Amino acid sequence: MLSFKFAKSASKVIGNRNFHSSSASLANTTKLFINGKFVESKTKEWLEVRNPATQELVTKVPVSTKEEMEAAVKAASDAFPAWRDTSVSNRSRIISNYKNLINKNMDKIAAIITEEQGKTLPDAKGDVFRGLEVVEHSVNVASLMMGETVENVSKNVDIYSYVQPLGVCAGITPFNFPAMIPLWMFPLAIACGNTFVLKPSERVPSASMFLVQLAQEAGVPDGVVNVIHGGKEAVNFICDAPEVRAISFVGADQAGRHIHARGTANGKRVQSNMAAKNHATIVPDAHKERTLDALTGAAFGASGQRCMALSAAVFVGESKNWIPELAERAKKLKVAGGAAPGADLGPVISAASKQRIHELIQSGIDEGAKCILDGRNVVVDPEFSKGNFVGPTILTDVKPHMRCYKEEIFGPVLVCLNVDTVDQAIQLINANPYGNGTAVFTSSGAVARKYQREIDVGQVGINLPIPVPLPFFSFTGSRGSFVGAGHFYGKTGVQFFTQIKTITSNWRDDDISHGVSSSMNMPILGKN
């Protein structure tokens, strides 16, 4: 049952949630998903999930016991041989069924996201849709799992390769995209023939639970996808479990580097997408209205809690004169609960996050920046008076040494820097340690081409503020924003979840009717 008052209509849409307990003693708690069953945890430690717009309790998440985590990994390990041997065509049909169920239930998933994460309903639907795109691409995974063949490398000798699944894989997901990031991970992994253990963010568990419920309805066999809950203990268990072959992670810097170090030390593949400081470069010849609209949406949408949010704007030359108009646009944005009519920004995830954002805003002011739009005391409707709200905030005259520039704020705060030339903008951005995304706004093809060639950032938008690639490409954040063995989804995503087996085959013509003699010499292929 949905707990927040302003979305009572959404509770009628969602209906029964198998993943929430109906037991009187475990009322309002979230289950585990192990070997095809939603299981009540035997833990004595629970974490509260509260609606960030109202502070009302939504559910309690178990800190999975060691025995429960071991059971999840065992279920995945036991299910792997049969799932690996399921034909790629049948796996694709199941993923296609899953795609259809996600599409059918998009409104329900979005309502769950808004309740637990806080983002507006339209933004929550976008969260689901961007994940759905990866599921759609996973349906056609067979075309990316084709091996290679060279015939007759030597007389009667052929070499060919197979692309095969790894085994048990795991995913650790963040709070900011409760549907999209899990859907980046386990659908592609299982489409490739792997089995999976998912640990969703303990702050937003229910979207992941509903997604695995739909996967079961789509025909995913028992044990192929499993869900555990918890914090650091669950993360370390995944990093250490010998059965787990690969780990996908999206989240904060410290956690990402810990998972990469611990996982790789245990012989696992790890892909770790971490923090960002995404810059927009505004050239004076850009289309002014479109640029300001793009900056407003990309800086303040989702309350700045996107790993690809534009959190820094670099104004070249006279384009700095556009900043007052940008502030006027930001002032008009409505801050409210995510399901409230007309809401543009919802709350940030927690009171601690709100406090940190406030501190970073103040640090900028203390270090000499000007706060031309201050969202720290934003006024919201009385029903949201307890929520974690921060309004759009703009700091100008920011310098690279300031804390508000150096750190990822992860809130609706845009820091503005001024430079004289595009070259200076490129130098400034390349000096920043992060490399997730950037955008340039210009009407000059020459400037755009120079920017895309010289900028040391993994994803570049040209007159497009949030350049997240569609899934037939890959999400290619770089430098301080990524460590690991391969990027998410696309070709590199398939490569991450698979391994290559190469076969050298020797079927000699004379073996048909004659005996075979032994040779003690080193075999040399290609000589004959």
From Swiss-Prot:
EC numbers for this chain: 1.2.1.27
SUPFAM superfamilies, per database record: ALDH-like (SSF53720)
Biological classification of the source: Eukaryota, Amoebozoa, Evosea, Eumycetozoa, Dictyostelia
PROSITE patterns: ALDEHYDE_DEHYDR_CYS
Organism in which the protein naturally occurs: Dictyostelium discoideum (Social amoeba)
Protein name (database record): Probable methylmalonate-semialdehyde/malonate-semialdehyde dehydrogenase [acylating], mitochondrial
Keyword tRNA-binding among record annotations: no
Subcellular location: Mitochondrion
GO molecular function, one term: methylmalonate-semialdehyde dehydrogenase (acylating, NAD) activity
